[in-house]
Design a protein with these regions (language model features):
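Intrinsically disordered, low-complexity segments of exported/surface proteins
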Residues: 1-410
Length: 410
Protein backbone atom coordinates (compact mmCIF):
# COMPACT_ATOMS: atom_id res chain seq x y z
CA UNK A 1 0.00 0.00 0.00
CA UNK A 2 1.34 3.43 -0.95
CA UNK A 3 1.23 5.53 2.22
CA UNK A 4 0.90 8.83 0.34
CA UNK A 5 -2.52 7.94 -1.09
CA UNK A 6 -4.68 9.38 1.74
CA UNK A 7 -2.71 12.64 1.68
CA UNK A 8 -3.01 12.81 -2.10
CA UNK A 9 -6.79 12.31 -1.99
CA UNK A 10 -7.05 15.07 0.65
CA UNK A 11 -4.92 17.44 -1.46
CA UNK A 12 -7.06 16.74 -4.54
CA UNK A 13 -10.26 17.45 -2.60
CA UNK A 14 -8.82 20.67 -1.14
CA UNK A 15 -7.71 21.81 -4.60
CA UNK A 16 -11.21 21.19 -5.99
CA UNK A 17 -12.90 22.97 -3.08
CA UNK A 18 -10.71 26.07 -3.47
CA UNK A 19 -11.32 26.20 -7.23
CA UNK A 20 -15.11 25.90 -6.82
CA UNK A 21 -15.09 28.71 -4.27
CA UNK A 22 -13.13 30.86 -6.73
CA UNK A 23 -15.68 30.08 -9.45
CA UNK A 24 -18.57 31.03 -7.16
CA UNK A 25 -16.84 34.33 -6.39
CA UNK A 26 -16.63 35.35 -10.05
CA UNK A 27 -19.05 38.08 -11.12
CA UNK A 28 -18.66 37.55 -14.87
CA UNK A 29 -20.38 34.16 -14.97
CA UNK A 30 -24.04 33.15 -15.14
CA UNK A 31 -25.30 30.65 -12.54
CA UNK A 32 -25.43 28.00 -15.29
CA UNK A 33 -21.83 28.70 -16.34
CA UNK A 34 -20.70 28.39 -12.72
CA UNK A 35 -22.44 25.05 -12.30
CA UNK A 36 -20.89 23.74 -15.53
CA UNK A 37 -17.39 24.75 -14.45
CA UNK A 38 -17.82 23.27 -10.98
CA UNK A 39 -19.04 20.01 -12.52
CA UNK A 40 -15.87 20.00 -14.61
CA UNK A 41 -13.79 20.45 -11.45
CA UNK A 42 -15.59 17.54 -9.76
CA UNK A 43 -15.00 15.31 -12.78
CA UNK A 44 -11.28 16.10 -12.75
CA UNK A 45 -11.00 15.47 -9.00
CA UNK A 46 -12.89 12.19 -9.37
CA UNK A 47 -10.60 11.03 -12.18
CA UNK A 48 -7.50 12.00 -10.18
CA UNK A 49 -8.65 10.12 -7.06
CA UNK A 50 -9.40 6.99 -9.10
CA UNK A 51 -5.93 7.22 -10.66
CA UNK A 52 -4.39 7.58 -7.20
CA UNK A 53 -6.27 4.47 -6.04
CA UNK A 54 -4.78 2.48 -8.94
CA UNK A 55 -1.24 3.87 -8.55
CA UNK A 56 1.45 1.38 -7.53
CA UNK A 57 4.20 3.76 -6.43
CA UNK A 58 4.60 6.97 -4.43
CA UNK A 59 6.20 8.55 -7.49
CA UNK A 60 3.10 7.92 -9.60
CA UNK A 61 0.87 9.29 -6.82
CA UNK A 62 2.92 12.50 -6.75
CA UNK A 63 2.72 12.81 -10.55
CA UNK A 64 -1.06 12.35 -10.56
CA UNK A 65 -1.42 14.96 -7.82
CA UNK A 66 0.61 17.48 -9.84
CA UNK A 67 -1.41 16.74 -12.99
CA UNK A 68 -4.62 17.27 -11.00
CA UNK A 69 -3.42 20.70 -9.83
CA UNK A 70 -2.68 21.73 -13.41
CA UNK A 71 -6.04 20.42 -14.65
CA UNK A 72 -8.10 22.16 -11.96
CA UNK A 73 -6.18 25.40 -12.43
CA UNK A 74 -7.00 25.33 -16.16
CA UNK A 75 -10.78 25.01 -15.65
CA UNK A 76 -12.47 28.10 -17.03
CA UNK A 77 -9.29 29.28 -18.74
CA UNK A 78 -8.80 29.57 -22.49
CA UNK A 79 -7.24 26.50 -24.08
CA UNK A 80 -3.83 26.29 -25.73
CA UNK A 81 -3.27 23.82 -28.60
CA UNK A 82 -1.18 20.71 -27.92
CA UNK A 83 0.52 20.96 -31.31
CA UNK A 84 2.78 23.98 -31.24
CA UNK A 85 3.34 25.74 -34.56
CA UNK A 86 6.78 25.39 -36.14
CA UNK A 87 8.24 28.87 -36.78
CA UNK A 88 11.61 30.20 -37.87
CA UNK A 89 11.99 33.03 -35.32
CA UNK A 90 9.59 33.28 -32.34
CA UNK A 91 10.63 36.90 -31.79
CA UNK A 92 9.71 37.90 -35.34
CA UNK A 93 6.65 36.00 -36.50
CA UNK A 94 5.61 36.35 -40.13
CA UNK A 95 2.04 37.27 -41.06
CA UNK A 96 1.47 33.68 -42.21
CA UNK A 97 2.74 32.32 -38.88
CA UNK A 98 0.53 34.73 -36.92
CA UNK A 99 -2.50 33.66 -38.94
CA UNK A 100 -1.65 29.98 -38.31
CA UNK A 101 -1.50 30.60 -34.54
CA UNK A 102 -4.97 32.18 -34.56
CA UNK A 103 -6.29 29.22 -36.56
CA UNK A 104 -4.83 26.68 -34.09
CA UNK A 105 -6.22 28.54 -31.05
CA UNK A 106 -9.67 28.70 -32.65
CA UNK A 107 -9.63 24.91 -33.17
CA UNK A 108 -9.32 24.24 -29.43
CA UNK A 109 -11.68 27.05 -28.42
CA UNK A 110 -14.53 26.30 -30.87
CA UNK A 111 -17.20 28.17 -28.88
CA UNK A 112 -15.16 31.38 -28.48
CA UNK A 113 -16.90 34.57 -29.62
CA UNK A 114 -13.67 36.11 -30.86
CA UNK A 115 -9.99 35.24 -31.23
CA UNK A 116 -7.64 38.09 -32.16
CA UNK A 117 -4.33 39.75 -31.39
CA UNK A 118 -4.37 42.49 -28.75
CA UNK A 119 -2.22 45.63 -28.78
CA UNK A 120 0.58 43.82 -26.94
CA UNK A 121 0.79 41.09 -29.56
CA UNK A 122 -0.83 38.43 -27.37
CA UNK A 123 -3.74 36.32 -28.58
CA UNK A 124 -6.95 37.43 -26.90
CA UNK A 125 -9.79 34.91 -26.65
CA UNK A 126 -13.30 36.09 -25.77
CA UNK A 127 -15.38 33.22 -24.42
CA UNK A 128 -19.10 32.59 -24.73
CA UNK A 129 -19.54 34.15 -21.30
CA UNK A 130 -17.86 37.33 -22.48
CA UNK A 131 -14.78 37.03 -20.28
CA UNK A 132 -11.35 37.28 -21.89
CA UNK A 133 -8.17 35.27 -21.65
CA UNK A 134 -4.81 35.72 -23.32
CA UNK A 135 -2.21 33.37 -24.74
CA UNK A 136 1.38 34.44 -25.34
CA UNK A 137 2.49 33.39 -28.84
CA UNK A 138 5.80 32.19 -27.36
CA UNK A 139 3.87 29.50 -25.45
CA UNK A 140 2.43 27.89 -28.58
CA UNK A 141 5.34 27.97 -31.04
CA UNK A 142 8.39 25.79 -31.52
CA UNK A 143 11.58 26.05 -33.57
CA UNK A 144 13.53 23.36 -35.38
CA UNK A 145 15.91 22.94 -32.44
CA UNK A 146 12.92 22.24 -30.15
CA UNK A 147 11.85 19.21 -32.19
CA UNK A 148 14.23 16.87 -30.36
CA UNK A 149 12.81 17.48 -26.86
CA UNK A 150 11.23 14.01 -26.82
CA UNK A 151 7.75 15.27 -27.67
CA UNK A 152 8.38 16.84 -31.04
CA UNK A 153 8.75 20.32 -29.56
CA UNK A 154 5.42 20.01 -27.73
CA UNK A 155 4.71 19.60 -24.02
CA UNK A 156 2.04 16.91 -24.45
CA UNK A 157 1.76 13.85 -26.71
CA UNK A 158 -0.90 13.18 -29.32
CA UNK A 159 -1.74 9.53 -30.18
CA UNK A 160 -0.98 8.27 -33.66
CA UNK A 161 -4.19 6.27 -34.17
CA UNK A 162 -7.37 8.29 -34.49
CA UNK A 163 -10.51 6.67 -33.09
CA UNK A 164 -13.02 5.42 -35.67
CA UNK A 165 -16.44 6.95 -34.99
CA UNK A 166 -19.76 6.91 -36.82
CA UNK A 167 -20.47 10.64 -36.62
CA UNK A 168 -17.64 13.05 -35.66
CA UNK A 169 -20.19 15.81 -35.04
CA UNK A 170 -22.14 13.73 -32.52
CA UNK A 171 -19.78 11.64 -30.42
CA UNK A 172 -21.31 8.95 -28.22
CA UNK A 173 -20.21 8.38 -24.64
CA UNK A 174 -18.41 5.24 -25.85
CA UNK A 175 -16.58 7.30 -28.51
CA UNK A 176 -15.48 9.82 -25.89
CA UNK A 177 -14.29 7.11 -23.51
CA UNK A 178 -12.20 5.51 -26.28
CA UNK A 179 -10.68 8.88 -27.22
CA UNK A 180 -9.74 9.60 -23.60
CA UNK A 181 -8.17 6.13 -23.27
CA UNK A 182 -6.05 6.65 -26.41
CA UNK A 183 -4.77 10.02 -25.17
CA UNK A 184 -4.06 8.68 -21.67
CA UNK A 185 -2.06 5.80 -23.14
CA UNK A 186 0.57 8.20 -24.50
CA UNK A 187 0.47 10.64 -21.57
CA UNK A 188 1.14 8.55 -18.42
CA UNK A 189 -0.15 9.89 -15.09
CA UNK A 190 -1.93 12.78 -16.82
CA UNK A 191 -5.49 14.02 -16.29
CA UNK A 192 -7.49 13.84 -19.53
CA UNK A 193 -10.97 15.31 -20.03
CA UNK A 194 -13.23 15.68 -23.05
CA UNK A 195 -16.00 18.22 -23.65
CA UNK A 196 -19.22 18.01 -25.67
CA UNK A 197 -17.42 19.20 -28.81
CA UNK A 198 -14.87 16.40 -28.52
CA UNK A 199 -12.03 18.75 -27.58
CA UNK A 200 -9.66 16.91 -25.25
CA UNK A 201 -7.76 18.72 -22.51
CA UNK A 202 -4.61 17.13 -21.11
CA UNK A 203 -2.79 18.16 -17.92
CA UNK A 204 0.59 16.58 -17.17
CA UNK A 205 2.59 16.06 -13.97
CA UNK A 206 4.91 18.81 -15.24
CA UNK A 207 2.10 21.32 -14.82
CA UNK A 208 1.44 21.68 -18.55
CA UNK A 209 -2.11 21.89 -19.89
CA UNK A 210 -3.12 21.96 -23.54
CA UNK A 211 -5.97 20.83 -25.77
CA UNK A 212 -6.40 18.64 -28.83
CA UNK A 213 -9.30 19.36 -31.23
CA UNK A 214 -11.65 16.47 -31.99
CA UNK A 215 -10.72 16.52 -35.68
CA UNK A 216 -7.18 15.43 -34.77
CA UNK A 217 -8.41 12.48 -32.72
CA UNK A 218 -11.28 10.93 -34.71
CA UNK A 219 -11.92 9.54 -38.18
CA UNK A 220 -14.74 7.68 -39.91
CA UNK A 221 -14.76 4.23 -41.50
CA UNK A 222 -14.72 5.99 -44.88
CA UNK A 223 -11.54 7.86 -43.89
CA UNK A 224 -9.70 4.55 -43.49
CA UNK A 225 -9.93 3.99 -47.26
CA UNK A 226 -7.70 7.04 -47.89
CA UNK A 227 -3.96 6.54 -48.56
CA UNK A 228 -3.13 7.68 -45.00
CA UNK A 229 -6.10 5.77 -43.51
CA UNK A 230 -7.37 9.09 -42.15
CA UNK A 231 -4.48 9.10 -39.69
CA UNK A 232 -1.40 11.19 -38.98
CA UNK A 233 1.38 11.57 -41.57
CA UNK A 234 3.46 9.50 -39.15
CA UNK A 235 3.05 5.75 -39.75
CA UNK A 236 3.89 2.69 -37.66
CA UNK A 237 5.05 -0.79 -38.66
CA UNK A 238 2.73 -3.78 -38.56
CA UNK A 239 5.48 -6.08 -37.28
CA UNK A 240 6.23 -5.47 -33.60
CA UNK A 241 9.69 -6.05 -32.11
CA UNK A 242 10.24 -8.85 -29.59
CA UNK A 243 11.56 -7.35 -26.36
CA UNK A 244 10.87 -5.17 -23.34
CA UNK A 245 9.54 -1.70 -24.15
CA UNK A 246 12.25 -0.15 -21.97
CA UNK A 247 15.15 -2.19 -23.38
CA UNK A 248 17.55 0.03 -25.42
CA UNK A 249 18.35 -2.81 -27.84
CA UNK A 250 14.67 -3.44 -28.60
CA UNK A 251 14.07 0.32 -28.86
CA UNK A 252 16.90 0.59 -31.40
CA UNK A 253 15.18 -2.03 -33.59
CA UNK A 254 11.86 -0.18 -33.32
CA UNK A 255 13.56 3.11 -34.17
CA UNK A 256 15.06 1.54 -37.29
CA UNK A 257 11.65 0.25 -38.41
CA UNK A 258 10.03 3.65 -37.77
CA UNK A 259 12.72 5.53 -39.69
CA UNK A 260 12.42 3.11 -42.62
CA UNK A 261 8.68 3.80 -42.82
CA UNK A 262 9.04 7.53 -42.10
CA UNK A 263 11.95 8.67 -44.30
CA UNK A 264 11.43 12.34 -43.34
CA UNK A 265 11.63 11.59 -39.61
CA UNK A 266 13.86 14.01 -37.72
CA UNK A 267 13.77 12.06 -34.48
CA UNK A 268 12.32 9.06 -32.65
CA UNK A 269 12.25 9.41 -28.86
CA UNK A 270 11.09 6.93 -26.22
CA UNK A 271 9.61 7.88 -22.83
CA UNK A 272 9.99 5.93 -19.58
CA UNK A 273 7.14 3.58 -20.57
CA UNK A 274 8.51 2.83 -24.05
CA UNK A 275 5.99 5.00 -25.92
CA UNK A 276 7.67 6.36 -29.06
CA UNK A 277 7.25 9.94 -30.28
CA UNK A 278 8.08 10.37 -33.96
CA UNK A 279 8.77 13.87 -35.26
CA UNK A 280 8.99 14.68 -38.97
CA UNK A 281 11.11 17.45 -40.47
CA UNK A 282 8.01 19.63 -40.97
CA UNK A 283 7.20 19.52 -37.24
CA UNK A 284 4.44 16.91 -37.51
CA UNK A 285 4.54 14.68 -34.46
CA UNK A 286 2.63 11.68 -33.13
CA UNK A 287 3.15 9.25 -30.27
CA UNK A 288 2.83 5.48 -30.61
CA UNK A 289 1.94 3.46 -27.50
CA UNK A 290 4.55 0.88 -26.47
CA UNK A 291 1.98 -1.93 -26.80
CA UNK A 292 1.76 -1.19 -30.55
CA UNK A 293 5.54 -1.54 -31.01
CA UNK A 294 6.78 -4.30 -28.71
CA UNK A 295 5.75 -7.90 -28.04
CA UNK A 296 6.91 -10.63 -25.69
CA UNK A 297 8.39 -13.97 -26.84
CA UNK A 298 5.14 -15.61 -25.70
CA UNK A 299 3.07 -13.22 -27.82
CA UNK A 300 5.38 -13.80 -30.80
CA UNK A 301 4.56 -17.52 -30.59
CA UNK A 302 0.83 -16.89 -31.00
CA UNK A 303 -0.97 -17.49 -34.35
CA UNK A 304 -0.84 -13.76 -35.17
CA UNK A 305 2.87 -13.60 -34.18
CA UNK A 306 1.93 -11.12 -31.47
CA UNK A 307 0.95 -8.45 -33.99
CA UNK A 308 -2.34 -6.56 -34.36
CA UNK A 309 -2.03 -6.81 -38.14
CA UNK A 310 -0.95 -10.03 -39.87
CA UNK A 311 1.39 -10.30 -42.86
CA UNK A 312 0.51 -12.87 -45.54
CA UNK A 313 3.12 -15.64 -45.91
CA UNK A 314 2.86 -15.68 -49.71
CA UNK A 315 4.17 -12.49 -51.35
CA UNK A 316 2.67 -11.16 -54.59
CA UNK A 317 4.75 -11.34 -57.78
CA UNK A 318 5.28 -7.89 -59.33
CA UNK A 319 7.12 -6.95 -62.51
CA UNK A 320 8.40 -3.49 -61.46
CA UNK A 321 8.50 -2.89 -57.68
CA UNK A 322 8.72 0.87 -58.24
CA UNK A 323 5.57 1.04 -60.37
CA UNK A 324 2.89 -1.47 -59.51
CA UNK A 325 -0.04 -2.04 -61.83
CA UNK A 326 -3.60 -1.86 -60.54
CA UNK A 327 -3.85 -5.64 -60.89
CA UNK A 328 -0.70 -6.13 -58.78
CA UNK A 329 -1.99 -3.75 -56.10
CA UNK A 330 -5.30 -5.63 -56.05
CA UNK A 331 -3.44 -8.93 -55.63
CA UNK A 332 -1.57 -7.52 -52.61
CA UNK A 333 -4.78 -6.10 -51.16
CA UNK A 334 -6.54 -9.46 -51.49
CA UNK A 335 -3.68 -11.33 -49.82
CA UNK A 336 -3.57 -8.90 -46.88
CA UNK A 337 -7.35 -8.94 -46.47
CA UNK A 338 -7.37 -12.74 -46.46
CA UNK A 339 -5.29 -12.82 -43.25
CA UNK A 340 -6.88 -9.72 -41.71
CA UNK A 341 -10.66 -10.30 -41.87
CA UNK A 342 -12.73 -7.11 -41.87
CA UNK A 343 -9.70 -4.84 -42.31
CA UNK A 344 -9.50 -1.90 -44.70
CA UNK A 345 -6.40 -2.14 -46.91
CA UNK A 346 -4.91 0.61 -49.09
CA UNK A 347 -1.90 -0.26 -51.28
CA UNK A 348 0.31 2.51 -52.69
CA UNK A 349 2.23 2.50 -56.00
CA UNK A 350 5.31 1.04 -54.29
CA UNK A 351 3.39 -1.87 -52.77
CA UNK A 352 3.28 -0.65 -49.17
CA UNK A 353 -0.03 -1.63 -47.54
CA UNK A 354 -1.75 0.58 -44.97
CA UNK A 355 -4.03 -1.68 -42.95
CA UNK A 356 -6.76 -0.60 -40.52
CA UNK A 357 -8.42 -3.23 -38.35
CA UNK A 358 -12.09 -3.10 -37.31
CA UNK A 359 -10.83 -2.09 -33.84
CA UNK A 360 -9.17 1.03 -35.29
CA UNK A 361 -5.52 -0.09 -35.27
CA UNK A 362 -3.62 1.22 -38.29
CA UNK A 363 -0.16 0.08 -39.38
CA UNK A 364 1.90 -0.25 -42.53
CA UNK A 365 3.28 -3.45 -44.00
CA UNK A 366 6.29 -2.47 -46.15
CA UNK A 367 6.42 -3.56 -49.78
CA UNK A 368 9.49 -5.72 -49.06
CA UNK A 369 7.26 -7.97 -46.93
CA UNK A 370 4.53 -8.17 -49.57
CA UNK A 371 6.12 -8.28 -53.02
CA UNK A 372 8.63 -10.39 -54.92
CA UNK A 373 10.05 -10.31 -58.44
CA UNK A 374 9.58 -13.14 -60.97
CA UNK A 375 13.25 -14.05 -60.37
CA UNK A 376 12.70 -14.27 -56.60
CA UNK A 377 9.58 -16.35 -57.16
CA UNK A 378 11.74 -18.93 -58.99
CA UNK A 379 14.03 -19.41 -55.96
CA UNK A 380 13.73 -22.48 -53.68
CA UNK A 381 11.74 -20.47 -51.10
CA UNK A 382 9.52 -19.01 -53.87
CA UNK A 383 10.69 -15.54 -52.82
CA UNK A 384 8.86 -15.74 -49.49
CA UNK A 385 10.19 -15.25 -45.96
CA UNK A 386 8.12 -18.19 -44.71
CA UNK A 387 8.06 -21.43 -46.69
CA UNK A 388 4.78 -23.32 -47.03
CA UNK A 389 4.83 -27.16 -47.08
CA UNK A 390 4.28 -28.76 -50.47
CA UNK A 391 1.85 -31.35 -49.13
CA UNK A 392 -1.30 -30.19 -47.41
CA UNK A 393 -2.45 -32.09 -44.33
CA UNK A 394 -5.56 -34.23 -44.65
CA UNK A 395 -8.17 -33.05 -42.11
CA UNK A 396 -11.58 -34.58 -41.41
CA UNK A 397 -13.06 -31.15 -40.62
CA UNK A 398 -11.03 -28.07 -41.70
CA UNK A 399 -13.19 -25.91 -39.42
CA UNK A 400 -12.28 -27.95 -36.30
CA UNK A 401 -8.77 -29.40 -36.41
CA UNK A 402 -7.80 -32.11 -33.94
CA UNK A 403 -4.58 -31.85 -31.89
CA UNK A 404 -3.04 -34.55 -34.08
CA UNK A 405 -3.90 -32.60 -37.26
CA UNK A 406 -2.45 -29.39 -35.78
CA UNK A 407 0.75 -31.29 -34.91
CA UNK A 408 1.00 -32.64 -38.46
CA UNK A 409 0.68 -29.11 -39.87
CA UNK A 410 3.29 -27.82 -37.39
Amino acid sequence: VVEDKPNARKAIEDEAKAKKEAIDARTDLTPKAKEDLKAEVDAIADQAKKAVDKATSATDVDKIEEADKAAIKAVGEVKEPVDKTLVKDPANLTDAEKAKLLEEVKKVNPTAKEVKYDEDGNIEVTTQNGDKGTIKPADIVKTEKDLDNGKGGNDINKPIDKVIVKDPANLTDADKAKIVDEVKAVNPNSIVTIDDKGTVTVSTPDGETAAIPAAELVRTKEDTTKPDAGNSKVVKPADKVVGEATDPAAQAKVEEKLKDLNPTAKSVKFDEKGNATVTLNDGTTATIPAKDLFKSPEEAAQPNAGNDIVKPADKAVVKDPANLTDAEKKAIEDKVKAVNPGATVVVDDKGNATVTTPEGKTAVIPATDLTKSPEEAAQPNAGNDIVKPADKTVAANPEKLTDAEKKAIE
